[in-house]
């Protein structure tokens, strides 16, 4: 699309890439005249302002010159990275002079803008170029084969690259090499190009076209490959661009024939080596890919020829073209619309003729508005492929599972004269781990669950606890896996039975501290864990003494006592007891406040009386522990849990642990935990977790922990999940409860935990921790993603079906079985379609013996004669990598009907039967000999394509020869009678020849090439073509061997993969182009064994259209 234009008949030069803003210098051309036939000359500098929508370029400065110019370049001499200095303008004049201008002075309007000039050349200077490595070096070319190298630091004395070429001729083009700073190339209209080495001061190679019709109008070096260059021809009879490689200078590497008439100028983009501009006498400006010859873009131009074309160094999408109609146009290869250009033409027309009626009526002229109304939008398409500078050099994207996918387009470093730089497209998949401690703790938890080592895991957590509360929680969790869990809970609450016994004993003053210590079995135990005999005797004596002291307080059984029946309380109690009225006796005792007597009598009166008495007692008693005693006696623990002061939550929990029944234990602990959780005190809220642990209530533990702890950090969530997992395992082991069903809150936490694990790359662990029995959409979606990330089938989804149906190969038809001493039939002059002549009797086919196939198929008895037809071959056999070459000794016959059965040849008395294809597939697995069979199977006349036949060696049966002998695979010649003889041939030890497998990334090459050959063979009718394809199939083994050994360079393997992709898309022309590229850019000795035959295969495939 056109961006700007300047109405000048001039040579052009862009400002260097370091300069900003972008300038375009123009110098009056010495080859053309403008429409005014003016003889004045000038230098002008225009600014490129792409923000301005108009087509006009702003003129910054004009310098009137006395010279007209054949060539103009703008070099970056003495410029820094900031572009403060504008470099130097170098102009080639028509009188052999070279003038150096200061652009900054021209822009500033100074009069003295010439830095230096020299007229050493003879004739006009048509060729100029600046060395990109040493910007002070400028090469120039003129008539009489004159080439000078100018040093801008010492402009007075130039040097020559060597002796002048003979015969003398004009120098039309000159260019410095883009990779090697001392290499220079020049070209002349005669079609000859010369490459100079400034270090040797002589030409090193000359390139010319053999047709002698190549009139060089353009020369350009490859931006990346030091040995490649292009030459353009101005001759209308040969309007081509030739791409040469100096390593193969006998003929052009590639010829671009996109122009219809001679080419006037070319320019190779430094930003993208796949963009080559060319303009010719056919009034076309084409942007082509020199590597493929494809035209990527055609600029919309007028019918005028362009004599100069250049890329903008700073903006790689912009180019300029100078045409013979006196206009310099600036274009963009990124496409756009030409509506602005059309509108400008309409505006010019209107301004020239006016838009009012010339007769003064003041009415607008309708015809001038009609083109504007009927005009359609014209869109110019951009390049067919994205240019290199807009391709992302690097990129990154996060994916599920903590994967970081990054790519980078790495250009391999080039060397002098080395291969073409290859753009290596690398994609890296990295695992990003940000929470290493989180993963470590998660791994420890998984190991504890898998090994069932919960006690040791809890102990480690206790030892590592930094707070007392954390230590208590893990201690409570540990108790779940130990014996006497309730007793251990009491100990954790501070109620140790041994310590309580000591306190009670001291309170009763029965024994001193020393005796208490003796009564404690733990204290008197010896170091080996057993009690000493002395300790046992002492304890026994103490027990007898206590019983004796207690018996002294009982009333004496001897003597008499008085039974009073008076009218006082005692007498009434006595009368009630004598009559068996326990209820009245108890009432009298309660009335007299004799509580102990009432309880004793109530016990004798039965449970019902005792219960009523206890209630009356508790109603009258007002001590501090009455409610506790009431709960103990009445077993009303819910009252204690609901009514106790929460400061005594430990005591309430201890009472529940001591007395509660298993069926009510969990509910009471939950009730106490709920009271603590609902209390405003944060300390009590955290203690509720201990109650929920005792109850085994995972859901409430999660809810309570979430309220009390900060769950935003991954380690905080890890703390919770560790407790939840251990508690669930404890409930599962101790209470035999189903823990698979989870609540909403727990499922959310487990899902969050699984997400964190997946984000750290632990997909399997995340899948293991994810709840199973839940229908929550987010969890089901996460499970689906985890299964897919791990490559496992997703529950509820069918596996993708195989797009083809597996077919079982048919079993071989049964062969004839000969009886004992049965003589074979003699058949003469037999032939077999597609078969081979068997060798004469006694000839051992070593190539058909597979040492690993022993014992795979049954064999015939030793005294039976078996008749076996030769192995049928639908086509020339394709040898496997470990098979010897097949020998075709019989000329091919016409194809027989499918139902044609070949006659059975005469064979030796002992013959190896051929097994069915399924048995042949098992020949790589050694096994024990199979028992003898009286039948053998023959294969069907056809086997699937690509399956190779391997000879089979079998052990003999009991009726055959001894085990130390082996049967040779012997076939008789057709028609030759064979006697009833045996040949005992001892098998020689053979060593299996093995090759490395082809790497998986290159296996597609073998599959693609072999499949292409098979398709060609099935379509080819010419015997000569089939022989070529057969030979190609064998010689491609050299390629496969190199792939196995991985001795090919990355450039070659990458090119082979490109060829394989072109074969898959049936684009054989592209494959041949890539083949030429590989051959021209690689070492010949590395590819000579297989690349010629690969070209044969591609050519035949293209010819056959398979």
Swiss-Prot record:
Pfam families: TPR_Sec16 (PF12931). It is found in: Cytoplasm; Cytoplasmic vesicle, COPII-coated vesicle membrane; Endoplasmic reticulum membrane. It is a peripheral membrane protein. A motif (ALG-2-binding site motif-2 (ABS-2),) lies at residues 842-848. Component of the coat protein complex II (COPII) which promotes the formation of transport vesicles from the endoplasmic reticulum (ER). The coat has two main functions, the physical deformation of the endoplasmic reticulum membrane into vesicles and the selection of cargo molecules. PANTHER family: PROTEIN TRANSPORT PROTEIN SEC31A, SEC31-RELATED PROTEIN. GO terms for biological process: COPII-coated vesicle cargo loading; endoplasmic reticulum organization; protein transport. COPII is composed of at least 5 proteins: the SEC23/24 complex, the SEC13/31 complex and SAR1. SEC13 and SEC31 make a 2:2 tetramer that forms the edge element of the COPII outer coat. The tetramer self-assembles in multiple copies to form the complete polyhedral cage. Interacts (via WD 8) with SEC13. Interacts with PDCD6; interaction takes place in response to cytosolic calcium increase and leads to bridge together the BCR(KLHL12) complex and SEC31A, leading to monoubiquitination. Interacts with KLHL12. InterPro entries: Sec16_Sec23-bd, SEC31-like, WD40/YVTN_repeat-like_dom_sf, WD40_repeat_dom_sf, WD40_rpt. The ALG-2-binding site motif-2 (ABS-2) contains a PXPGF sequence that binds hydrophobic pocket 3 of PDCD6. One of its GO terms (cellular component) is COPII vesicle coat. WD repeats lie at residues 4-47, 68-111, 120-160, 166-206, 209-254, 258-298, 301-342, 397-430. The lineage of its organism: Eukaryota, Metazoa, Chordata, Craniata, Vertebrata. This is Protein transport protein Sec31A. Residues 800-999 are annotated as: Interaction with PDCD6. Belongs to the WD repeat SEC31 family. Residues 161-471 are annotated as: Interaction with SEC13. There is a cross-link at residues 647, 1103 (Glycyl lysine isopeptide (Lys-Gly) (interchain with G-Cter in ubiquitin)). Residues 859-980 are annotated as: Disordered.
């Amino acid at each position: 699309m056109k961006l700007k234009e300047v109405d000048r008949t001039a040579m052009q030069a862009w400002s260097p890439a370091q300069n900003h803003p972008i300038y375009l210098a123009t110098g009056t051309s010495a080859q053309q005249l403008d429409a005014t036939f003016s003889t004045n000359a000038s230098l002008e500098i225009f600014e490129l302002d792409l923000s301005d929508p108009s087509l006009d370029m702003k003129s910054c400065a004009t310098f009137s010159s006395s010279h007209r110019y054949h060539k103009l370049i703008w070099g970056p001499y003495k410029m820094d990275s900031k572009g403060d200095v504008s470099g130097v303008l170098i102009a080639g004049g028509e009188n052999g002079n070279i003038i150096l201008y200061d652009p900054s002075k021209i822009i500033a309007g100074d009069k003295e803008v010439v830095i230096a000039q020299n007229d050493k050349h003879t004739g006009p200077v048509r060729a100029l170029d600046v060395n990109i490595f040493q910007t002070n070096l400028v090469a120039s070319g003129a008539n009489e084969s004159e080439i000078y190298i100018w040093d801008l630091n010492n402009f007075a004395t130039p040097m020559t690259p060597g002796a002048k070429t003979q015969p003398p001729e004009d120098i039309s083009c000159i260019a410095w090499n883009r990779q090697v700073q001392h290499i220079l190339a020049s070209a002349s209209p005669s079609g000859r190009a010369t490459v100079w080495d400034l270090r040797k001061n002589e030409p090193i190679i000359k390139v010319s076209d053999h047709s002698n019709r190549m009139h060089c109008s353009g020369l350009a070096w490859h931006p990346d490959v030091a040995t490649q260059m292009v030459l353009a021809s101005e001759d209308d009879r040969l309007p081509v661009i030739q791409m040469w490689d100096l390593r193969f200078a006998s003929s052009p590497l590639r010829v671009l024939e996109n122009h219809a008439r001679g080419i006037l100028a070319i320019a190779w983009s430094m930003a993208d080596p796949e963009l080559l501009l060319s303009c010719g006498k056919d009034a076309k400006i084409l942007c082509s890919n020199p590597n493929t010859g494809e035209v990527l873009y055609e600029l919309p131009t007028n019918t005028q020829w362009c004599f100069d074309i250049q890329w903008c160094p700073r903006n790689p999408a912009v180019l300029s073209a100078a045409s013979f109609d006196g206009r310099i146009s600036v274009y963009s290869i990124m496409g756009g619309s030409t509506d602005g250009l059309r509108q400008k033409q309409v505006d010019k027309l209107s301004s020239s003729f006016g838009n009012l009626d010339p007769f003064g009526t003041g009415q607008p002229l309708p015809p001038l508005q009609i083109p504007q109304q009927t005009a359609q939008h014209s869109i110019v398409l951009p390049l067919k492929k994205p240019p290199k500078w807009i391709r992302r050099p690097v990129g990154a994207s996060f994916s599920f599972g903590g994967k970081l996918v990054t790519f980078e387009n790495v250009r391999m470093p080039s060397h002098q004269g080395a291969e073409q730089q290859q753009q290596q497209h690398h994609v890296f998949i990295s695992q990003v781990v940000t929470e290493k401690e989180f993963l470590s703790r998660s791994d420890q938890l998984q190991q504890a669950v898998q090994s069932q080592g919960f006690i040791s895991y809890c102990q480690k957590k206790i030892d590592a606890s930094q707070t007392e509360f954390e230590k208590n929680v893990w201690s409570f969790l540990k108790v779940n896996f130990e014996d006497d869990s309730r007793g251990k809970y009491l100990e954790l609450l501070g109620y140790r039975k041994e310590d309580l016994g000591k306190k009670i004993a001291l309170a009763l003053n029965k024994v001193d501290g020393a005796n208490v210590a003796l009564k404690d079995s733990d204290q008197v135990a010896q170091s080996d864990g057993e009690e000493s005999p002395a300790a046992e005797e002492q304890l026994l004596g103490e027990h007898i003494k206590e019983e004796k002291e207690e018996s002294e307080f009982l009333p004496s059984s001897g003597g008499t006592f008085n039974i009073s029946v008076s009218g006082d309380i005692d007498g009434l109690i006595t009368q009630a007891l004598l009559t068996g009225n326990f209820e009245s006796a108890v009432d009298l005792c309660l009335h007299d406040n004799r509580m102990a007597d009432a309880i004793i009598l109530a016990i004798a009166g039965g449970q019902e009386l005792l219960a009523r008495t206890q209630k009356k007692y508790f109603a009258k008693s007002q001590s501090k522990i009455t409610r506790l005693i009431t709960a103990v006696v009445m077993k009303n623990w819910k009252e204690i849990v609901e009514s106790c002061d929460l400061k005594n939550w430990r005591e309430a929990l201890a009472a529940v642990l001591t007395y509660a029944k298993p069926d009510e234990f969990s509910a009471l602990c939950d009730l106490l935990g709920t009271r603590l959780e609902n209390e405003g005190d944060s300390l009590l809220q955290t203690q509720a977790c201990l109650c929920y642990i005792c109850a085994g209530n995972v859901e409430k533990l999660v809810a309570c922990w979430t309220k009390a702890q900060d769950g935003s950090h991954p380690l905080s969530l890890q703390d919770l999940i560790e407790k939840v997992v251990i508690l669930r395992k404890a409930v599962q082991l101790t209470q035999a409860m189903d823990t698979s069903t989870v609540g909403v809150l727990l499922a959310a936490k487990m899902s969050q935990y699984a997400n964190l694990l997946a984000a750290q790359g632990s997909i399997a662990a995340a899948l293991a921790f994810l709840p199973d029995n839940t229908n929550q959409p987010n969890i089901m979606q996460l499970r689906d993603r985890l299964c897919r990330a791990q490559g496992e089938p997703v529950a509820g989804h069918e596996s993708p079906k195989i797009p083809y149906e597996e077919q079982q190969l048919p079993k071989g038809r049964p062969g004839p079985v000969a009886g004992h001493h049965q003589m074979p039939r003699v058949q003469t002059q037999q032939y077999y379609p597609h078969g081979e002549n068997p060798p004469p009797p006694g000839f051992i086919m070593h190539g058909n013996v597979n040492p690993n196939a022993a014992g795979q198929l049954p064999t015939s008895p030793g005294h039976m004669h078996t008749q076996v037809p030769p192995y049928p071959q639908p086509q020339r056999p394709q040898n496997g990598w470990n098979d010897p070459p097949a020998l075709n000794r019989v000329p091919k016959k016409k194809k027989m009907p499918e139902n044609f059965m070949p006659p059975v040849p005469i064979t030796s008395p002992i013959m190896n039967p051929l097994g069915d294809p399924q048995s042949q597939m098992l020949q790589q697995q050694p096994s024990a000999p199979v028992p003898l069979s009286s039948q053998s199977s023959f294969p069907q006349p056809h086997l699937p394509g690509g399956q190779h036949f391997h000879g089979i060696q079998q052990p003999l049966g009991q009726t055959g020869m001894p085990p130390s002998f082996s049967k040779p695979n012997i076939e008789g010649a057709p028609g030759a009678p064979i006697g009833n003889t045996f040949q005992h041939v001892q098998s020689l030890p053979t060593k299996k020849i093995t090759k490395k497998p082809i790497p998986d990334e290159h296996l597609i090459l073998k599959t693609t090439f072999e499949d292409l050959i098979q398709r060609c063979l099935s379509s080819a009718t010419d015997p000569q073509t089939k022989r070529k394809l057969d030979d190609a199939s064998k010689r491609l083994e050299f390629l496969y061997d190199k792939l196995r050994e991985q001795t090919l360079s990355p450039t070659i393997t990458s090119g082979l993969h490109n060829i394989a992709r072109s074969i898959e898309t049936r684009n054989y022309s592209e494959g041949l182009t890539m083949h030429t590229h590989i051959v021209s850019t690689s070492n010949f000795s590395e590819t000579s064994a297989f690349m010629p035959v690969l070209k044969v295969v591609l050519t035949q495939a293209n010819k056959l259209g398979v």
